[in-house]
Design a protein with these regions (language model features):
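Active-site donor-binding loop signature of nucleotide-sugar glycosyltransferases
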Residues: 31-33, 212, 471
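N-terminal glycine/serine-rich phosphate-binding loop of ATP-dependent small-molecule kinases
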Residues: 1-98, 110, 114, 126, ...
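Active-site core segments that coordinate phosphate-bearing ligands/cofactors
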Residues: 3-5, 17, 109, 116-173, ...
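Short linear loop/turn motifs
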Residues: 208-216, 328-331
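Carbohydrate-associated surface elements
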Residues: 105
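Flexible loop residues that form catalytic
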Residues: 83, 215, 411
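Divalent-metal (Mg2+/Mn2+/Ca2+)-assisted nucleotide/phosphate chemistry catalytic cores
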Residues: 204
């Protein structure tokens, strides 16, 4: 018997089918093969058509089932991971009223800023744990003002994962975790935030019924089953945003555990066992997948924009022509820790939330024409990225998160020995690398929700550990010294 996971990304839809007994992936596919388009009608806007996601899901699902050589009756449950914060609006016929305003669209920033000021910063942070910012509620406020005809026709609002679940099951439901990422959830009262809804003038009727993150959220309809080759009544038993789901995929569920990614941008996602917030709003706090009223489990999310994109820029523009990433790592390894005094601040991909939304751009410090080479630049870029991670993780420490372990997929910058050693050394934390992805995590989440697995520990018992990186005492001291120099240069630049 099998479990199916869908990962609804902004670039593609990924589907994995997992054998429930072995926990191994037996089939996977993704679509589109080229990156999905994002429409930007104006600077700072970003939209996608939710019906395109649904088309991609159907293609990827059929492809994964074909590769796995399974039939619909073999699939016991479906789980969904999705790009966070996007706004989908539908009418009473469940028809999409406008393109989705997705996570990277910034048009709603002024609405969130005004709400933060008018509701009160302290009250927002103590109840919502965040500023309303550029999140889903603020995106809806933009529609209310600029597209009132559409707003008046809205039956329900949804996140991207809610929409795909609706297309599969015909049911419109959401989760506490989803409402919290939209900044609709009052953590102090454990309920929909009446204060925020009243401030924006939203009717409670717009909000979907709440279901558990793990548990029955709907069943595949007869028409969808016939179209996709699924069995009618196949349950959808899990959904979560991509970052909480990535943490689940890495079995990051308890306080002190950290999930990290090092792609174009970087994410550090830590679990906090206390209801807490950053008074400067440098990180965001949402309900984690296993958060309940009885057991606090909050996901503290730190995003760093300038991560893999800096390493890629160095490869294209500074490194010797034709070099690959492994060769770039070898080149960087010829330079000592600290790069003979050279530092790079990796903030050249837009404003950074952990710097209180300041856009300071990327900059090079301590450059000496008689000492420094391309190799120094290659290493300083990776060290600068690591030090940005450390800077953000120190904010998490201030919030009371005692970081015990960092878990990541064996991909992107975590393939670099320099990056791994530097991160372990400067944070004094063990790094564990695993072979997993979001669609696999969603499939296993479905297994938990369907009761096939007793708990996450059983679901992820087969999680394959690729590597463990321990902090090296001598190197750690050198990295910590280099970090202090980097941090001083950052503070002079802010």
């Amino acid at each position: 018997m099998c479990l199916l996971g869908c990962d609804i990304g902004s670039s593609s839809i990924k589907v994995s089918i997992v054998d429930e007994e072995t926990g191994l992936t037996i089939g996977a596919d993704f679509y589109p093969k080229e990156e999905a388009p994002i429409k930007a009608l104006r600077p700072g806007w970003a939209e996608q058509n939710p019906e395109d996601w649904w088309s991609y899901v159907k293609i990827a699902m059929k492809g994964a089932m074909s590769k796995a050589k399974v039939k619909g009756e073999d699939i016991k449950a479906i789980g969904i991971s999705y790009q966070m914060h996007g706004l989908v609006v539908v009418d009473k016929k469940m028809e999409v009223l406008r393109p989705s305003i997705i996570w990277c669209d910034s048009r709603a920033v002024p609405y969130g800023e005004r709400a933060f000021k008018n509701i009160g910063e302290k009250r927002c942070l103590s109840h919502l744990l965040n500023s309303p910012g550029n999140f889903t509620a603020s995106k809806l406020a933009w529609i209310k003002e600029y597209e009132p005809d559409i707003y008046d026709r809205i039956h329900k609002i949804m996140l991207p994962g809610d929409f795909i679940a609706m297309r599969l099951t015909g049911d419109i439901v959401t989760t506490v975790s989803g409402l919290s990422e939209g900044i609709f959830w009052d953590f102090k009262n454990n309920a929909l935030s009446e204060e925020l809804m009243n401030y924006y003038g939203f009717s409670k009727d717009l909000i979907a019924d709440i279901r558990p993150t793990f548990g029955l959220q709907g069943e595949v309809t007869a028409s969808v089953a016939a179209e996709l080759g699924l069995k009618k009544g196949t349950p959808v038993t899990y959904r979560a945003g991509d970052q909480p789901n990535n943490a689940l995929s890495l079995n990051v569920l308890n306080p002190g555990e950290i999930a990290a990614t090092g792609g174009t941008s970087g994410v550090v996602y830590g679990v906090n066992g206390k209801v807490n917030y950053d008074t400067l709003s440098r990180v965001n706090t949402f309900a984690h997948v296993n958060h309940t009223m009885e057991q606090t489990r909050l996901g503290v999310l730190l995003c760093i924009n300038g991560v893999g994109i800096l390493n890629s820029w160095i490869k294209r523009n500074i490194a010797p022509e034709g070099i690959n990433y492994n060769e770039l790592n070898d080149l960087a390894a010829t330079v000592p820790i600290g790069c003979d005094g050279l530092s790079i601040l990796p903030f050249g991909n837009g404003a950074e939330r952990m710097l209180q939304n300041k856009q300071i751009d990327c900059s090079v410090h301590g450059l000496n024409f008689n000492i420094h080479t391309k190799a120094h630049m290659a290493r300083a870029a990776q060290e600068g990225i690591v030090f940005a991670f450390k800077y953000g993780m120190d904010i998490m420490n201030e919030m009371g998160i005692d970081i015990q372990v960092i878990r990541a997929g064996n991909a992107n910058l975590f393939l670099s020995p320099i990056f791994r050693d530097a991160l372990a050394g400067v944070t004094g934390t063990v790094i564990e690398l695993y072979d997993t992805n979001g669609a696999v995590g969603a499939a296993k989440g479905a297994g938990i929700g369907a009761g096939i697995y007793k708990n996450a520990e059983e679901a992820f018992a087969s999680l394959k550990k690729i590597n463990v990186i321990e902090p090296d005492g001598f190197k750690a001291n050198a990295y910590c010294g280099a970090f202090e120099i980097w941090k001083e240069r950052l503070e002079q630049s802010i």
